[in-house]
Amino acid sequence: MSHTPTPAAGSGHASANSQTALVIGAIGVVFGDIGTSPLYTLKEAFSPHYGLTPDHDTVLGILSLVFWALMLVVTLKYVTVIMRADNDGEGGIMALTALAQRTLPGGSRSMYVVGILGIFGASLFFGDGVITPAISVLSAVEGLQVAAPKLEAFVVPITLVVLGMLFLAQRFGTERVGKAFGPITLVWFFALGAIGVYNMARAPEVLHALNPWWGVLFFVEHNWHAVFVLGAVVLAVTGGEALYADMGHFGAKAIRRSWQFVVLPMLTLTYLGQGALVLRDPSAVSNPFYEAVPEWALYPMIVLATAATVIASQALITGAYSVASQAMQLGYIPRMHIRHTSHSTIGQIYVPAVNWCLLLAVAVAVVGFGDSTSLATAYGVSVTGTMLITTVLMVIYARANPRVPAPLLWLFALVFLAVDCAFFYANIIKFLDGAWFPLLLGLILFTLMRTWRRGRKLLHDEIRKDGIKLDTFLPGLMLAPPVRVPGTAVFLTADPMVVPHALMHNLKHNKVLHERNVFLTVETLQGPYAAAGKRLKIEAIGDEFYRVHVRFGFMETPDVPLALMRSCDQGGIYFDPMDTTYFASRETIVASANRGMPIWRDKLFALMHRNAAPATGFFRIPGNRLVELGAQVEI
């Protein structure tokens, strides 16, 4: 089960306050995306693209499908089942991939396939990260068209300004403004509920939509066309995957309470309220969200909606930084500069490269599609693809759990694979209408991640093939020992059994050895955090030479000097930061058509490797203590 952050010790009242704070915080961060779905879900369902007439039976059928999608996909699948699979308290597709791989034989074909699924799921997440800010903010600003139609020409420019300010502000962090996210989003949800009740009171028969029979009748009446309409229905559950992805920040308990007692009831009320309005006035389908708002509250609602969509976008941008950081740690993407924006919260980071790539892609989406209706056709495919992959990974993970009855597991697999496949199919058939955009983004990212992963393996194999075994090198070196100089030399190496290139270059050109020599290997675990007792492994191999393994979880920021400081506490190596020099190899990649990858992928890997952030910043190594020695490697 998930590890909910422990409240401060004290009275039960303090514990209750802590839980309340977590619930409000979860509402602001976790539910921003799904909370802004009412802006466009019903509008998209009745867009000309689907050819539906907003008559009584059709409206109730769509509302029934929306409500039961929320119940099945979010409440049953994510809240009840998926959130039980935590990786030391962490959730998300990368964490679930690691859990699923643990149940499979190491190095097996199935483990490789699961890794591919995880990479593709993470790639789709970034595609979602482009569409969500674009469609959310654009939908909110489109309220100006309802309030003053003459402002229609200003919708896209205003959207670009809002998004530009949002991305430009990332470098300053969100620690201060983030405290307001929960209360603002809470006001947003209660406003949704109030508007829903206001409209339901005028057409209470809309409550019949809670009966799933209306959803069944919709399928009976519309046959295969109903499956096509699922492409709009799924917009109501976009953001549901955030419940699992953000589990490590707030804990499963707070997220479940937020969903059950605030988010689900308010979403149900607002969808029913929009449906009640359409039952009374079918022309309101042009923008049922804003048409449902009383005229006196329209401008305040536009402001509140814009704030809510900015918060939803912020949560997803922050999530993109987190996934990128995890992917770096797990070796799926090159090292990038990471800036910590908070002195008190380690998880608050800013990744400039990710930020500017997201801004560029979001701006292209806003300008290219132009309105939320067009963007909606592109939206669902990345979300449903991620949801489908999550179900597959969950089945693989749960299959190895003896506490899960086999009939229950296969029932889960049958029901949710069918639901996820139906939603995915309904979106993939919109490929030419816009679904190609997030798929193209996902494919580009998938190619980059696979190329980096494969290239790193080829590079490692090439270095190992040409390398000299440490166990045979050291005895020969001691037969004619070079001059020793005071201090400690730390050689960063991926393979602790082979002599690092940096050591060979140092001996060749400087003809000296340091008093103490450490061969340091940094390992990233499949878990989010490394236990204190397993952080460091020190092996003395004679004559002041040491092998040191430093382990970090994929959620941690590697700090090599700090880890070595702790080696003194363990009684291993004497370590003085001011008397230590770090040596690292900086390989220059030479592409070859006769090796493991096509020449274009070799060149792509060489480009990525050349532009990767140096080890100095990534491992927190002081720049004035680092010596990088070049080596040319052909792959």
From Swiss-Prot:
UniProt superkingdom: Bacteria
Keywords assigned by UniProt, alphabetized: Cell inner membrane, Cell membrane, Ion transport, Membrane, Potassium, Potassium transport, Symport, Transmembrane, Transmembrane helix, Transport
Chief location of this protein within or outside the cell: membrane
Membrane topology: Multi-pass membrane protein
Reaction catalysed by this enzyme: K(+)(in) + H(+)(in) = K(+)(out) + H(+)(out)
Pfam families in alphabetical order: K_trans (PF02705), K_trans_C (PF22776)
Membrane-spanning ranges: 22-42, 59-79, 111-131, 148-168, 180-200, 216-236, 259-279, 297-317, 349-369, 378-398, 404-424, 428-448
GO annotations of cellular component type: plasma membrane
InterPro entries: K+_transporter, K_trans_C, K_trans_N, Kup
Subcellular location: Cell inner membrane
Single GO MF descriptor: symporter activity
Purpose of the protein: Transport of potassium into the cell. Likely operates as a K(+):H(+) symporter.
Family per similarity comment: Belongs to the HAK/KUP transporter (TC 2.A.72) family.
Protein name, UniProt field: Probable potassium transport system protein Kup
Organism listed in the record: Xanthomonas oryzae pv. oryzae (strain KACC10331 / KXO85)
Source lineage: Bacteria, Pseudomonadati, Pseudomonadota, Gammaproteobacteria, Lysobacterales
